[in-house]
Amino acid sequence: MSHRKYEAPRHGSLGFLPRKRSANIRGRVKSFPKDVKSKPVALTAFLGYKAGMTTVVRDLDRPGSKMHKREIVEAATVVDTPPLVVVGVVGYVETPRGLRSLTTVWAEHLSEEVRRRFYKNWYKSKKKAFTKYSAKYAQDGAQVERELARIKKYASVVRVLAHTQIKKTPLAQKKAHLAEIQVNGGSVSDKVDWAKEHFEKTVSVDSVFEKDEMVDVAAVTKGHGFEGVTHRWGTKKLPRKTHRGLRKVACIGAWHPANVQWTVARAGQNGFHHRTSINHKVYRVGSAGDESSGATEFDRTKKTINPMGGFVRYGNVKNDFMLLKGSIPGVKKRIVTIRKSLYVDTSRRATENVNLKWIDTASKFGKGRFQTPAEKHAFLGTLKKDLEK
């Protein structure tokens, strides 16, 4: 019988404790990129809905690598990003204890889908949210202008309140997601003027992100419920003849201190945690309404980004979309927050110019053989179900 080790590295990271369910379904952003006043005014983040994943083929542009100028196959994620609607602006002042909210100015009219966010039960409510606030505009708007002037005078950070247009997605939910997004570039006065000009107007994703940019994605991961210690922490299974179970921790601590330490791996909630995945390269920013949104210079097939039959458990993307490298946290239909990278990545992977050669649009349900309905019809001919009865 071989000997056993006396010491071993611990299983699982303690850096993500507590491993409990996230309090909010939307990915929260606590930090934004550094403000550069010489750049034009623009948003630093965007909201979208995870639609699904696909496969892309491209030539690797990495001199010195054995795969340089050779085809590689990569996984990519499609995020449905309908335009955001700006409905407010918030000013923050710097204090010794950090940023403090100075005041918030809302737009005159708010749509029903965002007003639903302020009610737990919209059907039984009186639906009077923001009716008194809108009266400030009905008078002369002087009070609103005074609040905007306060932000220009005292604030050092300006963020806008923007909500998604969830009615443009295949989701059954009617309540839009609302978020604060920092505005960078220009002076504080320029930021406030930009926010006021965009009240009740839409901002598209192509005005925030561009191709080959590095972004971070904040979202809530897929939930797995109550899981055992072996799956939750990756601890080693015990030998076959172990009494009272194998997928357990044999020793959960010494006699004294007479309690279980917080560092000991235990069973509990796994998944549905808030996570931020950094450094995803933007492969494409396009519109699903474009009939060639899924085509490339190499593949001239007239097809959209949607696979045949739509994305499984999501449907068809009908708005602007982003194609990101790799996988991102969350399940399909989950709201995700996409933010500009906090630092400038100068690695070759980040600065590489990506030219996609092929985007897979075959059915994601089963083993898809055809890229377009026309290709399927050309191969199978007219099917019996398509004939007029």
Swiss-Prot record:
GO terms for molecular function: RNA binding; structural constituent of ribosome. It is found in: Cytoplasm. The keyword Transcription regulation does not apply. SUPFAM superfamilies: Translation proteins. InterPro entries: L3_arc_euk, Ribosomal_L3_dom_3_arc_sf, Ribosomal_uL3, Ribosomal_uL3_CS, Transl_B-barrel_sf. Keywords: Cytoplasm, Ribonucleoprotein, Ribosomal protein. The keyword Cytoplasm applies. PROSITE patterns: RIBOSOMAL_L3. Pfam families: Ribosomal_L3. GO terms for cellular component: cytosolic large ribosomal subunit. One of its GO terms (biological process) is rRNA processing. PANTHER family: 60S RIBOSOMAL PROTEIN L3-RELATED, LARGE RIBOSOMAL SUBUNIT PROTEIN UL3. Belongs to the universal ribosomal protein uL3 family. This is Large ribosomal subunit protein uL3. The gene is RPL3.
